[in-house]
């Protein structure tokens, strides 16, 4: 890229380009030239690589070949969407001057900046996923995290107390863009993220942030938001607001509040647990294999986004959960959910439309969609009439009619508007008299000219008179040369031809001025009227946002009612007493996508039963049994019904899972290291109110090492943490833990042998398993029979050796790792003593001897 400080060697157009580019060094600059957006120099090379564009060159400027690539202006949204997904930011530079009056390059300026976290255009967003902008400030080990959804207006603050907590929150939120200070060294996990944007350190100043928040919300302090003590997070929030003002170049009236989060109000879910429970992601990439894929039948996009947020932040507040349960129960009782579900399918994305109105970027079809949604409100309220649920009553109260707004939209916007205001034809006829006249002129020019020609023939008596038009002379009256001397005095000669004279009259000149610019003036008038309309619509922003929130929550509740009805789920009981009791529990996703009938199973945890050691065959269903327990608990804490015959759930603070593992090649961590990192997180952070799933701990190392770690981890969870723990293992030795810890029980997944085959019953039974059926599973997987036969011979050999070792070690019952240590000679001497036969003197002498031998 040429040095912008020395522009004298460049052409005037390149000078203009380089000056504008210097203001946006880290963004791709889309520079409008006619019907294309052009990119030059390094921007062109980068865009060509990212978008698979043809890279060309256009002569030289300043002694350097000008690399260039172009994008048609009418296709820009598709290219922007691809760049945003890649984490790129774009500055869009438009022609704002008039080419006809410009001396030198037409005046241009950046009119729009698009970044991953500030996108609001419908075409650039995933409709059912939040698009978040985050800012991170740091002071030692404490972080300030501010997160804003520009397209929805939600604004939150928190202060994670460690790098691990910060990364866990970022994993949950998955922001499209993260703002960090230019002088902040990044962790390895942060530095690899897309959409990372550096900002000046002073943008994170807490006092500056406080002033910006007070200005944004029009308050004198932040006490009402509960965040005055979160200095670091306030600094991060100030950085967000400044960044939005820099990029949006407009006020942000839809950002009306901010909420402080402590984390204690939600069930804790770390990144591993979200991944292992497959909430909204599956390794196959198939959405139908995820919990969200099964749950989401919402009618509106904003309902879908809210459901996703609920899944990732299950609540601990039982009052809110019971309100949701009661609402779902009432919708089920009289099947109102069916009518609601149908009505909500016609509801638009009012949340994002309101944000675009606030940012003055709403498109014509946004307004027609809003108009249709407002028309649906009376039917929704009528459907909810008479409900007793407090929550449904509150949501109904948010669906307020806006007759003035509805009337304005009906009067201002045509029934089926084009996508863009620049296309014209958006403002309805009758809304503005001048616009109607301009359109009439443009549309009826031919009729006017025919009428003028007839009128002039009558007035002059010249039958050969014609009224015509060409692009050079404009409109004219033409007379044959033979009749030119009879032209009226008010005719002004415009052009002389070989056989004719052409004239213009004041009336024709006035018409020409109107018609030639009528289209341009109509478009200009329409654009001004549309911008004024958006300004007027801003008055209804609070009401629209409140309505959107009500519609979204109503959509989720109706959706959960439909799922409960369709999939035969029940309302769980949320109780104060510790424990988890599930009768006939089912894994909701496996039940629906599996090819065979699902076998329900029970689970019982209580004050005196805190851990189940689960053994059984491979493919027997251990992981499914564990996951379904966690999913049922999670679903109960979003207010949903659950897949079970009965469920009773006591207080839960966190859900941890350690299920499956793979190498973290990018992070340089082996499978075993990943497993141990996740295990350490659980052992260090789980509490007596946590639900813990541990699957096959220790399998990534040697047998004795793995068994030792598995035993110690299970014992720590059982004795020290006392978390509700499902501990699946192939180490049969772990079943002995139940004999040492009264809170530990054994269960197994049942299977039966039929010849050389094994049939998995998937039923959970009390007690440990008898064997793992590994050879049978290998045969099912297609391992060659010769290998299976060889493995069976080796197994028999190993079992004979184990029996022999067991007999030699008798009467010790425990094998391998847990054989008791060889007793000390002093212990053996004491065990052989006849205490009753010793005299006092002999006892003292013996005690002295024993002391000497230690």
UniProtKB/Swiss-Prot annotation:
Question: A Gene Ontology biological process annotation?
Answer: mismatch repair
Taxonomically, the superkingdom here is Bacteria
> What does the UniProt keyword field contain?
ATP-binding, DNA damage, DNA repair, DNA-binding, Nucleotide-binding
A GO molecular-function term, please? ATP-dependent DNA damage sensor activity
What the entry lists under SMART domains is as follows: MUTSac, MUTSd
Q: Which PROSITE patterns match?
A: DNA_MISMATCH_REPAIR_2
Q: Where are the transmembrane segments?
A: none
Record-listed ATP binding positions: 616-623
User: Which Pfam families does the record match to this protein?
Assistant: MutS_I, MutS_II, MutS_III, MutS_IV, MutS_V
Q: Which HAMAP family match?
A: MutS
Q: What family, per the record?
A: Belongs to the DNA mismatch repair MutS family.
State what protein this is by name: DNA mismatch repair protein MutS
- Phylogenetic classification of the source organism: Bacteria, Pseudomonadati, Pseudomonadota, Gammaproteobacteria, Methylococcales
Gene encoding the protein: mutS
